[in-house]
């Protein structure tokens, strides 16, 4: 028996100002991170087929909290604060960067990081710093180049290949694919990656379900 994830059932659990206020460090968490204009909220909404799971904002940098969502038993998505915005004081930027670093380095249940970047402006300094932190911590990374519908097919493929070459310089496990919350490009790829990262928890759930099945009687 296998347990399949129904991403449309994902729901919000809680918000926290920092790692110390998150629920217990258990199960499997997949973190989503990106610059404030990378389309992170729209990507989460498309992934889960929900219009308002993650609140989209016209104001970059609005998401100041760590938001936790339940995908399935023991499986969570963590929406990390956006970074790289211009309209926020330096002190707050530095505070958020420290919080991101602390989360990546200390959260034991973190098993994968999705970094969202605008396909037209990828691999900015903070994007690279985030990937470096993840690689140093042994965390696999899936880069999704968002707003892929903004480029024609040939340009899109060329940009993906270019960023993949850049990603090789980090070492570690860093994959790169195109994504569009508007057209659906890359949605199946992202779900497949999350399925892979959640697999150990799903296997444990399936085993637990089998253990709870009543034994069939062989008595005549």
Swiss-Prot record:
Cofactor: Mg(2+)
Pfam family, one: MMR_HSR1
KW Magnesium (keyword) present: yes
One GO MF term attached to the UniProt entry: GTP binding
Cleaved signal peptide residues: none
Tree of life domain: Bacteria
Binding-site residues for Mg(2+), renumbered to this chain: 41, 63
One term under GO cellular component: cytosol
Key words of the record: Cell cycle, Cell division, GTP-binding, Magnesium, Metal-binding, Nucleotide-binding, Septation
Functional description taken from the UniProt entry: Necessary for normal cell division and for the maintenance of normal septation.
Family: Belongs to the TRAFAC class TrmE-Era-EngA-EngB-Septin-like GTPase superfamily. EngB GTPase family.
Name of the protein in its database record: Probable GTP-binding protein EngB
GN (gene name): engB
């Amino acid at each position: 028996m296998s347990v399949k994830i129904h991403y449309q059932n994902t729901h919000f659990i809680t918000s926290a100002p920092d790692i110390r206020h998150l629920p217990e460090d258990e199960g499997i968490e997949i973190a989503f991170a990106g610059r404030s204009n990378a389309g992170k909220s729209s990507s989460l909404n498309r992934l889960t087929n929900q219009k308002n799971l993650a609140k989209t904002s016209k104001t970059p940098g609005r998401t100041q909290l760590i938001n936790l969502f339940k995908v399935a038993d023991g499986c969570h998505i963590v929406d990390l604060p956006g970074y790289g915005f211009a309209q926020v004081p330096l002190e707050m930027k530095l505070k958020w960067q420290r919080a991101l670093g602390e989360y990546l380095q200390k959260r034991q249940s973190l098993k994968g990081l999705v970094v969202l970047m605008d396909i037209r402006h990828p691999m900015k300094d903070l994007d690279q710093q985030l990937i470096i932190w993840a690689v140093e911590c042994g965390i696999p990374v899936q880069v999704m180049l968002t707003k892929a519908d903004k480029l024609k097919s040939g340009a899109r493929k060329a940009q993906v290949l270019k960023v993949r070459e850049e990603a090789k310089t980090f070492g570690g496990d860093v994959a790169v694919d195109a994504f569009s919350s508007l057209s659906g490009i890359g949605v199946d790829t992202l779900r497949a990656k999350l399925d892979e990262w959640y697999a150990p928890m799903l296997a444990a759930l399936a085993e637990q379900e089998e253990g709870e099945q009543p034994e069939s009687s062989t008595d005549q």
